[in-house]
């Protein structure tokens, strides 16, 4: 009887822990930034004069390269927007990899977000590119990678094919909940 009870609890706890392990942690973009990374920035925000201060800009760039060690290796779900790096125009705009960014329209033509606010997505299989303003969710294991010089500076990476289109209402709801 005791042996059966022990086996029951062992299996029960294994199943519970295994189900938690498979569940993706929904991550907000601010969690990609470690605490105190930008503690030198005044609460009132950055002024135009601060952009002329080379030491301040150097600190700002250095802070953008800091990553949150607590979330590396975790199975996550992250909402954002696709910025394709290369597309095969002969194959209905197929992509093999892209950058996931927190806001629509962030691309090469505007100043990019800091490296700790971009996630390199490497696809297991090519997929069709999404429209620039189409919110998506990406699921996978978050890794830390060194930035690639002279291209983009993402310091996070996910290899996956779990890309899901999200409707605007769902994206707005997630954004509003993340601000609470």
Range-by-range predicted roles:
Residues 21-180:
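OB-fold and OB-like single-stranded nucleic-acid-recognition modules
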Residues 7-16:
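Bacterial N-terminal signal peptides
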Residues 1-4:
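Positively charged n-region of N-terminal signal peptides that target proteins for export
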């Amino acid at each position: 009887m005791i042996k059966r009870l022990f086996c029951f609890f062992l299996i029960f706890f294994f199943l519970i822990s295994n189900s938690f392990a498979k569940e993706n942690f929904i991550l907000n973009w601010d969690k990609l930034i470690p605490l105190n990374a930008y503690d030198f920035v005044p609460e009132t925000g950055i002024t135009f004069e601060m952009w002329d201060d080379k030491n301040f800009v150097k600190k700002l760039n250095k802070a953008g390269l800091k990553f949150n060690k607590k979330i590396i290796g975790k199975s996550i779900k992250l909402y954002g927007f696709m910025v394709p790096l290369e597309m095969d125009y002969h194959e209905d705009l197929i992509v093999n990899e892209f950058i996931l960014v927190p806001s629509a329209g962030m691309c090469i033509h505007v100043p990019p977000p800091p490296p700790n606010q971009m996630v390199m997505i490497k696809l297991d299989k090519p997929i069709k590119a999404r429209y620039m303003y189409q919110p998506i969710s990406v699921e996978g294991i978050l890794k830390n990678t060194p930035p690639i010089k002279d291209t983009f500076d993402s310091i996070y990476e996910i290899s996956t094919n779990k890309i899901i289109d999200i409707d605007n209402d769902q994206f707005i709801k997630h954004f509003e909940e993340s601000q609470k």
